Regions:
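Active-site-proximal substrate-binding groove within the catalytic cores of carbohydrate-active enzymes
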Residues: 1-106
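C-terminal beta-sandwich/jelly-roll accessory domains of carbohydrate-active enzymes
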Residues: 75-151
Length: 151
């Protein structure tokens, strides 16, 4: 569901046949989509560089926030965690980076940095752009959403 936040959030599904858990998941997705839509559809689209070809990252950077969708499309070639640098942020501001798990948590392996398991961290824009965030070692075909807001 994380990658569908980047486009038109429609459902090719007979939602009248959904059970309570599925209906609740759709409601959480719709709420998150509505919240993030102004940034995703109105921000600049950037593609942070990642070394391992299994990673994909798409950042939407607006005037007041950023949304980053991070995914793996295959098994990681390198077991060592990679850093995600977030371009386009004001280097002089502090930002709160939150992992948005409303639509499900990504499955990951043996490396999960504290900021990821805790769900949020506050850092300067300069550090996010130059040093970046250590990524968890996601299993194949997993994704997560980061919401970046100034504090």
């Amino acid at each position: 569901m994380a990658t569908s936040l980047m486009g038109s959030a429609g459902f090719e599904w007979d939602i009248l046949s959904c059970d309570e858990a599925e209906t609740a998941a759709i409601a959480r997705f719709a709420a998150l989509y509505k919240e993030l839509r102004p940034v995703v559809h109105g921000g600049r689209v950037l593609h942070p560089e990642l070394r391992d070809p299994a990673w994909r990252a798409t950042a939407f950077v607006g005037a007041t926030a950023a949304v980053v969708v991070v995914a793996t499309v295959a098994s990681l070639e390198d077991a060592r965690a990679e850093r995600l640098r977030l371009p386009g942020l004001d280097p002089d501001r502090r930002y709160r980076v939150r992992v948005r798990r409303e639509i499900g948590a990504a499955e990951y392996g043996w490396i999960a940095p504290e900021w990821f398991t805790a769900g949020e961290i506050e850092l300067p824009g300069s550090l996010l752009a130059e040093v970046g965030l250590q990524l968890p070692t996601l299993w194949p075909l997993q994704a997560f959403v980061l919401h970046v807001e100034p504090v």
